[in-house]
């Protein structure tokens, strides 16, 4: 055993600190949930007791529209008889700037997803291998190792990888609270900025996600103006991640930072940068189309040089240029995507409402922010992790705990709803129903004891076993005799 440990240490010494370190961030419950799914993925026929993937923020609701367009336009691919005549032109080495028709089509699409209220210059578009590569490129352009970016919480766990791992940049959390719907306030920004200063971390920028992942909320005009003014006053950069721009639905409105800076007099646009991609709005994460759009000429020049490490293939550029130039298709796709997202959101929220499960009111994104604080043994992240393990390994739903999103309050979970078909969603809701109904059955006999004890303590037992057979029961001792007994053990969030 000692020899093995020594050998392993020697192997690590052969590698760089970046390669052998844990900066990737994969040692978190966010990625552990993915591992549980990969080991036992749900399939309605082959693996009906498998884990349902609700931890993947992917838009699969309009795949039929995408397939229909591809079949109708074989000339968009250089690997078909209709498009092969362009093979030689596309397959040869291309400029790092990207195909002109690709940049023009992307700029037009970005305008359309922002209700044509702003214009984007194709010459300011820098391509990258997905939003992951785009974020890292921005970090390399704006910050040195040891510098920091302010990031409002909760935020996407992948930022720890995208912005920190290879750049050496620090992420400084801006603490937001459920009491005001996790809104970003100037007071919270000032507090985080001061904390960074006390920790000797030079703050180089503020990164915000709009619409928010994981909240599904959008930033209103006044909030965006306050963010622009804050960063301008501090002389730091504002990076707006807008990759969910076209996922709003219902009465929700997306306002881009590009629109707001037009309304602010004397705004220093050199400090404004946008990260975008086609992964969420078009449901094309596998094509790895990421975009850096900067109003800073120098950043555009530097980012273009850095893009050589993560270019979008010319074949993909060619396909995307053809697709996004079809305005009739794009209009139909965006319209239908919003309708289907609204319908799926209504389906899952109606189901949760019927079970008394709370969620943060929001109308954007491919997920919702579920409130299970009332089920925690104690208001700690250890209790949150304990509950999460039950949900993943017993209920067999891979939802992501708030702690992995750096949420300040334990008990929140992100639940993705657009990456599955209708029947799988029904199965997921049924599992939640079974879960909650059995909790009620377990707590009812304990009501008298609970009233006499007059205690409000909850207790998760590690020996919980769920069954989705007709018997459907829990092991004895799931709740302690001191558990409170509301009409449902889950309560709606007051947000």
Swiss-Prot record:
EC number: 4.4.1.14
Keywords, sorted A to Z: Ethylene biosynthesis, Fruit ripening, Lyase, Phosphoprotein, Plant defense, Pyridoxal phosphate, S-adenosyl-L-methionine
Needed co-factor(s): pyridoxal 5'-phosphate
pH dependence as annotated: Optimum pH is 7.3.
UniProt modified residues of type N6-(pyridoxal phosphate)lysine: 280
Disulfide bonds: none
GO terms assigned for molecular function: 1-aminocyclopropane-1-carboxylate synthase activity; identical protein binding; pyridoxal phosphate binding
Alphabetical list of InterPro entries matching this protein: Aminotransferase_I/II_large, Ethylene_sulfur-biosynth, NHTrfase_class1_PyrdxlP-BS, PyrdxlP-dep_Trfase, PyrdxlP-dep_Trfase_major, PyrdxlP-dep_Trfase_small
Residues given in the record as substrate binding sites: 58, 96
Post-translation changes: Phosphorylated on serine residue by MAP kinase (MPK6). May be processed at its C-terminus.
Expression sites (tissue/organ): Expressed in roots and flowers.
Catalytic class of the enzyme: lyase
Effect ascribed to mutating residue 480 to D: 40-fold increase in ethylene production
Reaction it catalyzes: S-adenosyl-L-methionine = 1-aminocyclopropane-1-carboxylate + S-methyl-5'-thioadenosine + H(+)
Domain of life, source organism: Eukaryota
The keyword S-adenosyl-L-methionine is annotated on this UniProt entry: yes
Induction: By indole-3-acetic acid (IAA) and cycloheximide (CHX). By auxin. By treatment with ozone.
Phosphoserine sites (modified residues): 480, 483, 488
PROSITE patterns: AA_TRANSFER_CLASS_1
Function, as annotated: 1-aminocyclopropane-1-carboxylate synthase (ACS) enzymes catalyze the conversion of S-adenosyl-L-methionine (SAM) into 1-aminocyclopropane-1-carboxylate (ACC), a direct precursor of ethylene. Involved in bacterial flagellin-induced ethylene production.
Record PANTHER family: 1-AMINOCYCLOPROPANE-1-CARBOXYLATE SYNTHASE 6, BIFUNCTIONAL ASPARTATE AMINOTRANSFERASE AND GLUTAMATE/ASPARTATE-PREPHENATE AMINOTRANSFERASE-RELATED
Miscellaneous comment: The stability of ACS proteins, and the regulation of such stability, play a central role in ethylene biosynthesis. The phosphorylation of serine residues on the C-terminus increases protein stability.
Record family assignment: Belongs to the class-I pyridoxal-phosphate-dependent aminotransferase family.
Complex formation: Homodimer and heterodimer. In vivo, the relevance of heterodimerization with other ACS enzymes is however unsure. Interacts with GRF3.
Protein name: 1-aminocyclopropane-1-carboxylate synthase 6
Gene source species: Arabidopsis thaliana (Mouse-ear cress)
Gene that this sequence comes from: ACS6
């Amino acid at each position: 055993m000692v020899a093995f440990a020594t050998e392993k240490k020697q192997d690590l010494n052969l590698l760089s600190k970046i390669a052998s370190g844990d900066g990737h961030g994969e040692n978190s419950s966010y990625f552990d949930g993915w591992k549980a799914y990969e080991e036992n993925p749900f399939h309605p026929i082959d693996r009906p007791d498998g884990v349902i993937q609700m931890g993947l923020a992917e838009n699969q609701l309009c795949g039929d529209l995408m397939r229909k367009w591809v079949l109708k336009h074989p000339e968009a691919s250089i690997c078909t008889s209709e498009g092969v005549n362009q093979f030689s032109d596309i397959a040869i080495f291309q400029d790092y700037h990207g195909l002109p028709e690709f940049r023009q089509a992307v700029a037009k699409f970005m305008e359309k997803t922002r209700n044509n209220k702003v214009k984007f210059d194709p010459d300011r578009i820098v391509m990258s291998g997905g939003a992951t590569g785009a974020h890292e490129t921005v970090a390399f352009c704006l910050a040195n190792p040891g510098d920091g970016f302010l990031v409002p919480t909760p935020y996407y766990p992948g930022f720890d990888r995208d912005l920190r791992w290879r750049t050496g940049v620090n992420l400084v959390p801006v603490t937001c609270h459920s009491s005001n719907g996790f809104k970003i306030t100037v007071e919270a920004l000032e507090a985080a900025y001061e904390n960074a200063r006390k920790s000797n971390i030079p703050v180089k920028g503020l990164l915000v996600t709009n619409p928010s992942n994981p909240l599904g909320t959008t930033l209103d005009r006044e909030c965006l103006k306050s963010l622009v003014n804050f960063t301008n006053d501090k002389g730091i950069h504002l990076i707006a991640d807008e990759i969910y721009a076209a996922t709003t639905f219902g009465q929700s409105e997306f306002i881009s930072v590009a629109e707001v800076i037009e309304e602010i007099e004397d705004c220093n646009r050199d400090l404004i940068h946008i990260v975008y991609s086609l992964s969420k709005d078009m449901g094309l994460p596998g094509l790895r189309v990421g975009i850096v759009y900067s109003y800073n000429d120098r950043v555009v020049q530097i980012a273009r040089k850095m893009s050589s490490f993560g270019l979008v293939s010319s074949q993909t550029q060619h396909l995307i240029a053809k697709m996004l130039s079809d305005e009739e298709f794009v209009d139909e796709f965006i319209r239908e995507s919003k309708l289907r997202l609204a319908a799926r959101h209504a389906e899952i929220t109606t189901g949760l409402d019927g079970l008394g499960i709370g969620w943060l009111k929001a109308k954007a994104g491919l997920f919702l922010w579920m409130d299970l604080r009332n089920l925690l043994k104690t208001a700690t992240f250890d209790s949150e992790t304990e509950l999460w393990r039950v949900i993943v390994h017993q209920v067999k739903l891979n939802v992501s705990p708030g702690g992995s999103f750096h949420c300040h309050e334990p008990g929140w979970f992100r639940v993705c709803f657009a990456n599955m078909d209708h029947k799988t969603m029904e199965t997921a809701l049924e599992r939640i129903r079974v879960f909650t109904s059995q909790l009620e059955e377990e707590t009812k006999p304990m009501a008298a004891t609970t009233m006499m004890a007059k205690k409000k303590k909850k207790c998760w037992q590690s020996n919980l076993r769920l069954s989705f057979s007709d018997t459907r029961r829990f092991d004895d001792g799931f709740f302690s005799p001191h558990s409170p007994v509301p009409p449902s053990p889950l309560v709606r969030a007051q947000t």
